[in-house]
Amino acid sequence: MHTLVFLSTRQVLQCQPAACQALPLLPRELFPLLFKVAFMDKKTAVLRELVHTWPFPLLSFQQLLQECAHCSRALLQERLSTESMQAVILGLTARIHAREAEAGTQPVCRKHTLRVLDMTGLLDDGVEQDPGTMSMWDCTAAVARTCIAQQQVGTAKPGLSPVPVEIRVDLRVNRASYTFLREALQSSVDSLLRLCCRDLRAEDLPMRNTVALLQLLDAGCLRRIDLRFNNLGLRGLSVIIPHVARFQHLASLRLHYVHGDSRQPSVDGEDNFRYFLAQMGRFICLRELSIGSSLLSGRLDQLLSTLQRPLESLELAFCALLPEDLRFLAQSSHAAHLKKLDLSGNDLSGNQLTPFQGLLQAVAATLLHLELTECQIADAQLLATLPTLTRCASLRYLGLYGNPLSMAGLKELLRDSVIQAELRTVVHPFPVDCYEGLPWPPPASVLLEASINEEKFARVEAELHQLLLASGRAHVLWTTDIYGRLAADYFNL
């Protein structure tokens, strides 16, 4: 939906040279809408000039590219145009160069000086990448190169330079991009472009590089650290964690692929684990924790007891959780605050089922997002859990992919979940009825890799759709797409 003001603005920008000349004559109140229209329609010349002459201290993508009163389209929920993103960066560079040229000849007007360009909140990479759009990796590279280029042109001179511009971004780094990102962070310290990271995701970096990068980040800006290693043991974790823990106001910590054998502990391993726990106790604002590691098996209580405040999001995928881990979590102070819970890859069938049901009851009042991928939940376990599951009245998302459920089990879930008014998304497995020659009980690997009968599954989808229509729940998405952008980020819950 577009208002008359939006359509008029779009018409004004059709001729870019004329629009650029007219910008100084337009009320500054129109600039936010001008920016959104120019970004949406890839009016790159206008975009560059808008950034160059931006009349406000803050230029925020999250504010400007969301749904607004004049346009219902939320661009931040889409992959952003490479042309438009590059135009913004070029406009910022032109602005800095112009201010440098003016600084020695006339006083700098600070009242309407752009101080912050906030490019955070961009859609993260999907499975497929449109070549005409900019991924988070591309954005990181583009911003880093801009900061390096600015440093090579010149640094700020005391008494003459304009106010530096802070670029807030979410950074993604791997082995290929590490060197120039480190250089960008180093060069931005004394530059007119100050690189400020809100969320950091590092993939497959050596420990020394990870530490070096963490040492360059501004603790006042950082909100999330997401470290993804191919293989990090307890010893490596004990090296990394003190550099992470210096960000005491961190809100989200995600540690993936941390390996350790809790069944055969060594003296060094126990010392490293205790050191890790001590460092975790330093965080005073942590609200989200994600750790995928079997080292927590049987001692989840030790980790959760060290934290200074209750968590609102807890992801414990493939942690080999034991019944006592689930019981402790249910009785802990965290349970009453959890909005997001991910227990994927933990067997919730045998002895774990009853403690899991107790945990569901404990989190029912607050839970919005529940992920149970590959948890060995068959029809019997699902039916036994439904009375507790449906008490989660605020639940919006339920992930059950990779579980050995039949069509009959899915239909029971659909019928019983009608009372969950907030439920919007159910990611369900391909029913076992759609496989041929399936061993029982089927391992998760078989469910994920075996071929299904497409004709049978088409009938299943049609029947589920009819049931949703009949129950007045057509707005609820039932899907087998685990690679879509359906799982909400904690900060967007």
From Swiss-Prot:
GO terms for biological process: negative regulation of NF-kappaB transcription factor activity; negative regulation of toll-like receptor signaling pathway. Pfam families: LRR_6. It is found in: Cytoplasm. LRR repeats lie at residues 111-146, 194-218, 219-246, 247-282, 283-307, 308-339, 340-360, 364-391, 392-416. GO terms for cellular component: cytoplasm. The keyword RNA-binding does not apply. Keywords: Cytoplasm, Leucine-rich repeat, Repeat. GO terms for molecular function: kinase binding. The keyword Ligase does not apply. Belongs to the PRAME family. LRRC14 subfamily. Interacts with IKBKB; disrupts IKBKB-IKBKG interaction preventing I-kappa-B-kinase (IKK) core complex formation and leading to a decrease of IKBKB phosphorylation and NF-kappaB activation. Interacts with CHUK. Negatively regulates Toll-like receptor-mediated NF-kappa-B signaling by disrupting IKK core complex formation through interaction with IKBKB. This is Leucine-rich repeat-containing protein 14. The lineage of its organism: Eukaryota, Metazoa, Chordata, Craniata, Vertebrata. The gene is Lrrc14.
